[in-house]
């Protein structure tokens, strides 16, 4: 799979819509503003609205595993924006620090107080405020474990996407949309999809256990 990245130096005009309000791991917009649609539903709805139009979709946020990448493309996205999955790498912003022998890196949302104070406040129409207490944040600040070089993560994302394409017989990215089929699953079905009935003894770079208590 050829790796195509969008960088800040891109300056070619194109018709693109960025889809995603609140799916990010450090975004609180859905709770603070009450705005947002589950990411896959949002992508599918926008793709349906853009039927027969030559407009590309960038899916922004909500990627936790490489399988989420495949699902977003299957739902109608042409490109994917990711943040938390790359947080903690050498290439990501943020200071490194150590807690109880573990190395972490700072990670904050664009809507967090710290980021707004550093310059992102204009994005949320709050540039006029100089006092931090006047900000109404739509993101949080936190830490993630240090992950090393980003190339390892990109390799796993490519591998997972390639595997997904193989399962559904997609020879290229366009065929993912044609060959994929979405079905609804229950809480039990989701639990079955995850690692269960065992205590993991060794970490794997492309999987992290999630809590089921909120389901």
What are these regions (language model features)?
Residues 13-16, 76-78:
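Structural recognition of alpha->loop->beta junctions
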Residues 23-25, 88:
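Feature marks short, surface-exposed loop/turn motifs that line or immediately flank catalytic pockets
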Residues 1-12, 212-214:
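Single conserved hydrophobic/aromatic residue that forms the stacking wall/gate
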Residues 34-59, 63-211:
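Alpha/beta catalytic cores of nucleotide-metabolism and tRNA/nucleoside-modifying enzymes
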Residues 28-29, 213:
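Ser/Thr-centric signal marking residues that sit
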Residues 16-23, 82-83:
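Non-cysteine beta-strand/loop elements that form the S-adenosyl-L-methionine
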């Amino acid at each position: 799979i050829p790796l195509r990245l969008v960088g800040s130096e891109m300056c070619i005009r194109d018709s693109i819509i960025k889809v995603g309000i609140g799916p990010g791991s450090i975004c609180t917009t859905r709770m603070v503003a009450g705005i947002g649609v589950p990411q896959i539903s949002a992508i599918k709805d926008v793709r349906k609205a853009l039927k027969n139009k030559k407009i590309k979709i960038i899916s922004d946020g909500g990627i936790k595993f490489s399988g989420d990448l495949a699902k977003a493309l299957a739902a109608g996205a042409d490109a994917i924006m990711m943040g938390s999955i790359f947080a903690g790498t050498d290439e990501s912003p943020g200071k490194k620090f150590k807690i109880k022998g573990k190395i972490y890196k700072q990670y904050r949302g664009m809507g967090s107080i710290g980021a707004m104070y550093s310059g992102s406040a204009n994005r949320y129409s709050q540039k006029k405020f100089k006092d931090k207490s006047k900000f109404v944040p739509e993101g949080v600040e936190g830490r993630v474990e240090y992950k090393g070089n980003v190339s390892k993560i990109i390799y796993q994302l490519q591998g997972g996407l390639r595997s997904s394409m193989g399962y559904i017989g997609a020879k290229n990215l366009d065929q993912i949309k044609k060959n994929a089929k979405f079905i609804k699953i229950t809480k039990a079905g989701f639990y079955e999809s995850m690692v269960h009935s065992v205590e993991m003894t060794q970490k794997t770079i492309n999987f992290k256990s999630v809590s089921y208590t909120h389901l």
